[in-house]
UniProtKB/Swiss-Prot annotation:
It comes from Schizosaccharomyces pombe (strain 972 / ATCC 24843) (Fission yeast). Its main location: endoplasmic reticulum. One of its GO terms (biological process) is protein transport. This is PGA2-homolog C27.01c. PANTHER family: PROCESSING OF GAS1 AND ALP PROTEIN 2.
Amino acid sequence: MGFDVAGYLQSYSLKDWIRIIVYVGGYMLIRPYLMKLGAKIQEREHRKSLLEGEVDGTLDPEMTHGTKPKEHGEFDTDDEEEEENPDAEFRWGYSARRRIRKQREEYFKNQDKSPLDAYADDDEDIEEHLED
């Protein structure tokens, strides 16, 4: 139940062989010109992207979230006015940023309390066992 290649090739007429040779030869002749044209278009697009601010063909990650770029020293987790942006194509890491923001708030809230304040109530428990 195999494919008979020899029989298949013998069934080609002279017209079919000439047609194949014309297609393959035409492709071989036109291909270098198509490659040069593609290189020119690619170079033009690369130059255009460099002028727009993209570096080495990579997109700014903030562009994928649809937000403005952060200034030096700002963290993505501190962005409290972040709203759902329907125009944003990607929402990678949104839950993680929200979780870290919540942890950071808890940490700073607990920093206001002194560890000595937690042990102040322990003296009351011990006083009943102490003798004057």
